[in-house]
């Protein structure tokens, strides 16, 4: 086989022949040095360097250095019969060619005539210099994979129409009519997916000006005959500068791509022997059809069409998507992409670009390449949706990062994964072609950029334990991940790796587009967790997710299973903590009615009746006894209301022995609320004796009983007594266990808020203890009987204070109970904003409530009576708030009218009244109540 060579610009012209083609025509075999250094090709292995798809090569032709483009003569249009004859003679010449370096002169002249006829400018009188052959650039393959080129000894004489001529059984006149239209179809395009043929005389690109079509430099795309040529891509397109020779016969025509008309490169795919239909040049003439030319001369397929327009990134991506969809959706043929990096890239002239990389011109100006997002199946996801590929093991670090899809680009442009039928599909087998393995082993420097493998921040919800942790980066996952986890709990749309080792190991099956968890129905959102799917993807936490039936069988408290809430009285399902004990609603109501109604229940048996869910109503006496044994007290509800106050156990080991029938849960709860002696407040059994020892001495009022009582003298004597008692309260509080642990400001505040309550409560105790509640015993020298009360100006107030000793008489309050209640009165009112030592205050108050329970148990031997007594005493403490409020109001009015009433107020008492009483009366304090009103 011989190659057609063009004449030099100054070679002798054939007599009577057509004009010689100019320098740089497609008939030249070896192109001269072009404007791009490093893009020289060789005869045997023409390796073309990658240059960008820029405007310099496609739109603006650049002549070779040192070449003067000659003017091309315009020839008249010849008839179709002349073209067919020339094509037949050219085919005969090629078939008879031997080792001669040039064809016969006659045939060469006829071939030149045919080429000058078909490739002439569209209009007469128009001339344009042809692009030099040295501007052979890297091919831009968008419609099929390619493999390393054939051995150098393979014949390289095929031109644009060589597939038509070399096909077995094909004659010069066979390609006519409709058959020719099917023969020019590309390999991956079926007749049902044909593009609409453009109308005659109309350009295929709207808005594109009609320009002359100079002769382009053709680059033949060679492909290897293999079974996987349509499923995977080779490392790089290898293009050879070929002669664009031959003319169409019987309707076939040589066409010029629009990109070549502006100085680009025409892609001439090599013949593939596997298919009966030949592969022709995927090029097209952009000029209108000449009047004397065959209709098929301008009806080549509009397959790879680069418009002669100033291309922007969006237009290029949109056109690429259109071209790729036309081929990749037909028959499942794979699509190959071999974009070149920009010219400014350091590797633009020598380093091959890995298959699947976009050029920088395909990105927005400020966009950073990110991880790839390839869908495995034909239903492509939105381009803006980023689904990070799962990294499987240490092999993932060897993978070269790939570019992220830009808006408008079809994911089918990436050849790494085959387009197959809908899911489910098995993982792809390891690649068997050396070209594909070379792509996976390409260094990261050949890629556009190194994308970080850190996942979205939108994917750190549920992670699975398998896989290596992702690398730390600017978008590293937060530290809330489980140890050793690298992906979400729900498998994302993972894709098989392109490396052989990762593909052999097998990747997680992709779940896109039908999201499902291990074959379960589709989830509504990715954060959903199905317990049935956890054994496959989330094994580390399965030990803590136990069925409810198993959890209820374990009576012990553990991390794995929380105890079921059951009533400690009857065993029914508990509704909450009522009166300090975990009980059901029925036992709660029963205990409240039994305690407030003061019923005297009697057991018909031996006080050992069974109380359960079925028989809890049989014996109310045993049910109430069990409630009290469990620790239910009416005051426990109030303790929970005030911030962090511990629930009080009505029966303690000191007051009552531990019952035998209390369940383990009740014992555990009782131990939780037992005060530890190792804390700051040392509450020991002789505490009541300590309270007795620090009780103040007898305080005298200094009233002169020899003189008749007047309103001013009596009130003045009471104020003097109040001043002395206030000093006594300060001294007593300093000796009170636990009070010095509070902040100094809290100590002063508590004394100022409670001094009136302590004074009137002491008055009631003295009246009850000394005169059995018949008179008001203010001091040994100031005792008011009922007659003196009536003569005083505050008789109504005396009747109010007289209620306290009468209650003591009614309840028969013991000294131990009084001492504990007195301490609780000191801790009975706090500011609205709380105290500085609020925690210590609550601990102290809870401790003295327990001491009151112990004091009650010293005299009350019955459990029921003890609980009722506690309720009555705490109810008395709550009633003191209203009584003391009346005293505050009278004291403040007297203080304001002290000069008019001639009543003297001591200095310290005056300061307390002026500073705190207005605040107390305005409701700016918080009384701590045991019971609701």
Swiss-Prot record:
Domain NR LBD stretches: 679-913
Region listing for Disordered, in residue ranges: 1-256, 335-378, 415-452
Chain intervals for the UniProt region annotation (Modulating, Pro-Rich): 1-566
SMART domains, A to Z: HOLI (SM00430), ZnF_C4 (SM00399)
Post-translational modifications reported in the UniProt record: Phosphorylated on multiple serine sites. Several of these sites are hormone-dependent. Phosphorylation on Ser-294 is highly hormone-dependent and modulates ubiquitination and sumoylation on Lys-388. Phosphorylation on Ser-102 and Ser-345 requires induction by hormone. Basal phosphorylation on Ser-81, Ser-162, Ser-190 and Ser-400 is increased in response to progesterone and can be phosphorylated in vitro by the CDK2-A1 complex. Increased levels of phosphorylation on Ser-400 also in the presence of EGF, heregulin, IGF, PMA and FBS. Sumoylation is hormone-dependent and represses transcriptional activity. Sumoylation on all three sites is enhanced by PIAS3. Desumoylated by SENP1. Sumoylation on Lys-388, the main site of sumoylation, is repressed by ubiquitination on the same site, and modulated by phosphorylation at Ser-294.
Residue ranges with Pro residues bias: 418-433
Organism encoding this protein: Pan troglodytes
Gene Ontology biological process: nuclear receptor-mediated steroid hormone signaling pathway; regulation of transcription by RNA polymerase II
Cross-link Glycyl lysine isopeptide (Lys-Gly) (interchain with G-Cter in SUMO), sequence positions: 388, 531
Region of interest (Mediates transcriptional transrepression), ranges: 165-305
Chain positions covered by the region annotation AF2: 687-933
Gene Ontology MF term list: estrogen response element binding; nuclear receptor activity; nuclear steroid receptor activity; steroid binding; zinc ion binding
Keyword Lipoprotein assigned: yes
The protein, known as: Progesterone receptor
Primary location: nucleus
Domain comment as written in the entry: Composed of three domains: a modulating N-terminal domain, a DNA-binding domain and a C-terminal ligand-binding domain.
InterPro entries assigned to the protein according to its UniProt record, in alphabetical order: NHR-like_dom_sf, Nucl_hrmn_rcpt_lig-bd, Nuclear_hormone_rcpt_NR3, Nuclear_hrmn_rcpt, Progest_rcpt, Znf_hrmn_rcpt, Znf_NHR/GATA
Region (AF1) location: 456-546
Binding-site residues for progesterone, renumbered to this chain: 766
Classification via PROSITE patterns: NR_LBD, NUCLEAR_REC_DBD_1, NUCLEAR_REC_DBD_2
Residues spanned by motif Nuclear localization signal: 183-187
Phosphoserine modifications at: 20, 81, 130, 162, 190, 213, 294, 345, 400, 676
Feature: DNA-binding region: 567-639
């Amino acid at each position: 086989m011989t190659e057609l060579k063009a004449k030099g610009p100054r070679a002798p012209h054939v007599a009577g022949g057509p004009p010689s083609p100019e320098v740089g025509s497609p008939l030249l075999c070896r192109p001269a040095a072009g404007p791009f250094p490093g893009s020289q090709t060789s005869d045997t292995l023409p390796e073309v360097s990658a240059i960008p798809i820029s405007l310099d090569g496609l739109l603006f032709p650049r002549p070779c250095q040192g070449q003067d483009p000659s003017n091309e003569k315009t020839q008249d249009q010849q008839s179709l019969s002349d073209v067919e004859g020339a094509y037949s003679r050219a085919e005969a010449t090629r078939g008879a060619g031997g080792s001669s370096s040039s064809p016969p002169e006659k045939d060469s002249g006829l071939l030149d005539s045919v080429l000058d006829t078909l490739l002439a400018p569209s209009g007469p009188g128009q001339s344009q210099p042809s692009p030099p052959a040295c501007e052979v650039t890297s091919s831009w393959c968008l419609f099929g994979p390619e493999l390393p080129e054939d051995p150098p000894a393979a014949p390289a004489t095929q031109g644009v129409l060589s597939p038509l001529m070399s096909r077995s059984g094909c004659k010069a006149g066979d390609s006519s009519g409709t058959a020719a239209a099917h023969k020019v179809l590309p390999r991956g395009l079926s007749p049902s997916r044909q593009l609409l043929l453009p109308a005659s005389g109309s350009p295929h690109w709207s808005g594109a000006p009609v320009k002359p079509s100079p002769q382009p430099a053709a680059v033949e795309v060679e492909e290897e005959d293999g079974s996987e040529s349509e499923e995977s891509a080779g490392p790089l397109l290898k293009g050879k500068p070929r002669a664009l020779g031959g003319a169409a016969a019987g309707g076939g025509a040589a066409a010029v791509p629009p990109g070549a008309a502006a100085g680009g490169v025409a892609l001439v795919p090599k013949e593939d022997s596997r298919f009966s239909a030949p592969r022709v040049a995927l090029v097209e003439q952009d000029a209108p059809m000449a009047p004397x030319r065959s209709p098929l001369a301008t009806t080549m397929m509009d397959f790879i069409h680069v418009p002669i327009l100033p291309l922007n990134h969006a237009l290029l991506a949109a056109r690429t998507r259109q071209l790729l969809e036309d081929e990749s959706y037909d028959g499942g043929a794979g699509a190959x992409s071999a974009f070149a990096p920009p010219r400014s890239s350091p590797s633009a002239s020598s380093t091959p670009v890995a298959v699947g990389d976009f050029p920088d011109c395909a990105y927005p100006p400020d966009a950073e390449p990110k991880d790839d997002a390839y869908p495995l199946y034909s239903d492509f996801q939105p381009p803006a949706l980023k689904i990070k590929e799962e990294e499987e093991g240490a092999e993932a670090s060897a993978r070269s990062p790939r570019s992220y899809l830009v808006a408008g680009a079809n994911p089918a442009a990436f050849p790494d994964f085959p387009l197959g039928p809908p899911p489910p599909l098995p993982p792809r087998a390891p690649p068997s072609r050396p070209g594909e393995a070379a792509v996976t082993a390409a260094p990261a420097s050949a890629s556009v950029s190194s994308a970080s493998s850190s996942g979205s921040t939108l994917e750190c919800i549920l992670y699975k334990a398998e896989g290596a942790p992702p690398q730390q980066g600017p978008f590293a996952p937060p530290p809330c991940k489980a140890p050793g986890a690298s992906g979400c709990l729900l498998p994302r749309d993972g894709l098989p790796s392109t490396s052989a080792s990762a593909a052999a190991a097998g990747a997680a099956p992709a779940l896109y587009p039908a999201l499902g968890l291990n074959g379960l129905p589709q989830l509504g959102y990715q954060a959903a967790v199905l317990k049935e799917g956890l054994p496959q993807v989330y094994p580390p936490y399965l030990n803590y997710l136990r069925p409810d039936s198993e959890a209820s069988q374990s009576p012990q408290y553990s991390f794995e299973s929380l105890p079921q809430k059951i009533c400690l009285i009857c065993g029914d399902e508990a509704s909450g903590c009522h009166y300090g004990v975990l009980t059901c609603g029925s036992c709660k109501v029963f205990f409240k009615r039994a305690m407030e109604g003061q019923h005297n229940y009697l057991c018909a048996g031996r006080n050992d009746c069974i109380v359960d869910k079925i028989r809890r109503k049989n014996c109310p006496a045993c049910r109430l006894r069990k409630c009290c044994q469990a620790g239910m007290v009416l005051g426990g509800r109030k303790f929970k209301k005030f911030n962090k106050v511990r629930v009080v156990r009505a029966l303690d080991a000191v007051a009552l022995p531990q019952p035998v029938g209390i369940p383990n849960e009740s014992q555990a709860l009782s131990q939780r609320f037992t005060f530890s002696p190792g804390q700051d407040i040392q509450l020991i059994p002789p505490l009541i004796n300590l309270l007795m020892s620090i009780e103040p001495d007898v305080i005298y009022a200094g009233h002169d009983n020899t003189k008749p009582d007047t309103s001013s003298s009596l009130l003045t004597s009471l104020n003097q007594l109040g001043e002395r008692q206030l000093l006594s309260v300060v001294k007593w509080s300093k000796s009170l266990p636990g009070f010095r642990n509070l902040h100094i400001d809290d100590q002063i505040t508590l004394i100022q808020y409670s001094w009136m309550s302590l004074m009137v409560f002491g008055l009631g105790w003295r009246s009850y203890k000394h005169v059995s509640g018949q008179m008001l015993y203010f001091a040994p020298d100031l005792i008011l009987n009922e007659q003196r009360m009536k003569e005083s100006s505050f008789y109504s107030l005396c009747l109010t204070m007289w209620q306290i000793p009468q209650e003591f008489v009614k309840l028969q309050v013991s000294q131990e109970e009084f001492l504990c209640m007195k301490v609780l009165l000191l801790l009975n009112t706090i500011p609205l904003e709380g105290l500085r030592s609020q925690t210590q205050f609550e601990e102290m108050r809870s401790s003295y409530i327990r001491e009151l329970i112990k004091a009650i148990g010293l005299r009350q031997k019955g459990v029921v009576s003890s609980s009722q007594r506690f309720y009555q005493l705490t109810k008395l403490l709550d009633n003191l708030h209203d009584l003391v409020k009346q005293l505050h109001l009278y004291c403040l009015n007297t203080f304001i009218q002290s000069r008019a009433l001639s009543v003297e107020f001591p200095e310290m008492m005056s300061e307390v009244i002026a500073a705190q009483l207005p605040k107390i009366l305005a409701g700016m304090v918080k009384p701590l109540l045991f019971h609701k009103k």
